[in-house]
Amino acid sequence: MSAGGALQTAIAAALGNVPDLTGVFDGPPARAAYPYAALDATTESDWGHKSSDGREVLVAITVWDDQPVRLHALADQVEANLQALPATEGWQLVTMRLVRRRVLRDVAGPWAAAIDFRARMLAV
């Protein structure tokens, strides 16, 4: 399994522990009740060295909700749940760092918390 695929599986499992989320999806769902999270961990670049393969994976998590106060609390819970990720198949998670977090809203749509992380992983 690719580093991004393994990481996405681990993140989905961790976000499943956030009780107020109605679902965690690999990309935007066609229909879902708020609040929910969509995640993407498919952008990978080389982070290897002489004796081991490695990957840097960019992780984008978007939490959608129609209530901004609850959205901020959910974004905090998402960050907290990613501090102790479960083991990833075939990869060792070396670092998982927050890159950026912002809250956005389309005039005609719901609120979104876009949370971006950078993960560095080594093959085991």
Name each region found by the language model:
Residues 33-43:
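A short, hydrophobic beta-strand-centered structural micro-motif
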Residues 28-32, 107:
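A short beta-turn/loop motif at secondary-structure boundaries
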Residues 1-23, 41-124:
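Charged, amphipathic alpha-helical segments and their flanking helix caps
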Residues 32-33, 87:
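Short loop/helix-cap segments at secondary-structure boundaries that form the rim of catalytic
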